[in-house]
Amino acid sequence: MKRYKNVRNRDINGILLLDKPKGISSGLFLNKIKKLFNAKKIGHTGTLDPLATGMLPVCFGKATKLAKYLLHSDKRYKVSAQLGVSTDTFDSDGTIISVSPVQSNDYILEQCLESFIGIRNQIPPMFSSLKYRGVPLYKYARKGIYFPRKPRSIHIYNLSLIKKTENIIELDVHCSTGTYIRSIVNDIGEYLGCGAHVIELRRLSVGQYISSSMINPATLEAIFYNDSFDDVQVFCKLDAFLTPMNMIMLELANISNEKC
């Protein structure tokens, strides 16, 4: 059954809180969601690496004008990192560039994590979607071309150890927008003198939106591919997952009042 045959892209408005799966870029994932909803206008509020999973708020229609508020909201992550191994991308998708023994103890690790809390400068990684002369930096990096990057001010509100198993550490990170978790992990590895890289990364919240509100994209696909539903029924069922504009505006107003 071919969906939406001879149906124009729809003008729909709202925010969809999606749980991005592992192994797909935010851009490709966004295109997939756009096709499922047959939406005319869509945008997200900050990319997640292909390796990463978790909260990706997707804005439809008029809600795209409000995306900047979420883009500049603080974020919370759970990250697992392997100590003793460094990669060129700072995560397990990259090439291993060094292997070193891990000699730090729990006390040194706690001191390390505490040193990151607060306002600090962070140099964005070359393997990132930031652009130089209109070209993403990661495309240069893949060719072995590296450029100096200007440090950016970030704020780490919390960086705490959840658990440690041999050379694998699991961390809770609450940070400002624009923070690269991969770079934090790489810097932790440098502090400890052994190197480190991200092996798992999950975004738990964006601003006021938390992980318990997320929708699994498999739920949306099950509706889309259900032959017992016609297009109108599919639209109704999918649209029910959207946070409507009036609720979004109310939430933003409440946030503004809390900051006053």
Swiss-Prot record:
Q: List GO molecular-function terms, semicolon-separated.
A: RNA binding; tRNA pseudouridine(55) synthase activity
Q: Which Gene3D superfamilies match?
A: Pseudouridine synthase (3.30.2350.10)
Where is the catalytic site? D49 (nucleophile)
Q: Which UniProt keywords apply?
A: Isomerase, tRNA processing
Q: Is RNA-binding tagged as a keyword?
A: no
What is this enzyme's EC?
Answer: 5.4.99.25
Name of a matching Pfam family: TruB_N
What's an example Gene Ontology biological process for this entry? Answer: mRNA pseudouridine synthesis
Catalytic activity entry: uridine(55) in tRNA = pseudouridine(55) in tRNA
Q: What does this protein do?
A: Responsible for synthesis of pseudouridine from uracil-55 in the psi GC loop of transfer RNAs.
Which family does the record claim for this protein? Belongs to the pseudouridine synthase TruB family. Type 1 subfamily.
Its recorded name reads tRNA pseudouridine synthase B
Native species: Blochmanniella pennsylvanica (strain BPEN)
* Gene name, Swiss-Prot/TrEMBL: truB
